[in-house]
Amino acid sequence: MSNNKIKRKDASPEQEAIESFTSLTKCDPKVSRKYLQRNHWNINYALNDYYDKEIGTFTDEVSTVAHPPVYPKELTQVFEHYINNNLFDIDSLVKFIEELGYNLEDLATLCLAHLLGYKKLEEPLKREDFLSTWFMQGCSTISDMQECIKTLDVKLHEDLQYFTQIYNYAFNLILDPNRKDIDTDEGIQYWKLFFQPEYPVRMEPDLLEAWFRFLRDEGKTTISKDTWRMLLLFFKRYPTIQKIISDYDETAAWPFIIDEFYECLQDQQ
């Protein structure tokens, strides 16, 4: 893979995004930062926003920008290989993921979805989003892309900031249309993946099992976005049942469901 910015160890994720955005758009880094910040550092959303506001539309890039990127033939061939009826749809994505060496249940798939700017996995991916993303990462072949995702997978295991970003991103990605909450069973499936010992946020296994048991015993059928996000902070601060019992502050701004969990643990002592 040539000039893969993901592998840089001396730059923060934000700085990497600014450099990639600036390289593609040729705009001032301050402008890059502005668009990235207001799009929560998702480079594909920021690019769409930039081209809409500064130039016209993202899809008009080729006709409007003086020097549009020329994508390598190998890269366009990868895209063409996976499309169905000119769409990179969910079936295309599943096949692509499998040929990268993963499956939909792997957390690395979330890294891929985040990189490509997916809001929902069921929505077709635009040609420009696919090509521009891999072009910015210096990837033209499946082999290049495999190395890129391996690098992100390692980052997910080692970088707490990136892990938190992917964890928070996952909620909206798995949320069904026209709903505000996810089913508890689905939440549990993903928590079992995110809170494996090899990832940055570690807690005693008994604590995670106690949380699952509490949800089931109390008939909690759905999980809100606030609960999803705050649970990660909760486990960072209180990695053991004993620490919760001894240090938990009921006056702090935790969701009510976490207060209930604390009371449940107290009753079991």
Swiss-Prot record:
Residues 14-51 form the UBA-like domain. Keywords: Phosphoprotein, Ubl conjugation pathway. Transmembrane segments: none annotated. GO terms for molecular function: cullin family protein binding; protein-macromolecule adaptor activity; ubiquitin conjugating enzyme binding; ubiquitin-like protein binding. It comes from the Eukaryota. SUPFAM superfamilies: UBA-like. InterPro entries: DCN-prot, DCN1-like_PONY, PONY_dom, UBA-like_sf, UBA_8. GO terms for biological process: protein neddylation. The modification Phosphoserine is found at S12. It holds the Pfam family Cullin_binding. Residues 70-266 form the DCUN1 domain. GO terms for cellular component: ubiquitin ligase complex. Interacts with the cullin CDC53. Interacts with ubiquitin via its UBA-like domain. Interacts with RUB1/NEDD8. Required for neddylation of cullin components of SCF-type E3 ubiquitin ligase complexes. Neddylation of cullins play an essential role in the regulation of SCF-type complexes activity. Does not act by preventing deneddylation, but rather facilitates neddylation, possibly by acting with HRT1/RBX1 to recruit the Nedd8-charged E2 UBC12 to the cullin component of SCF-type complexes. This is Defective in cullin neddylation protein 1. The gene is DCN1.
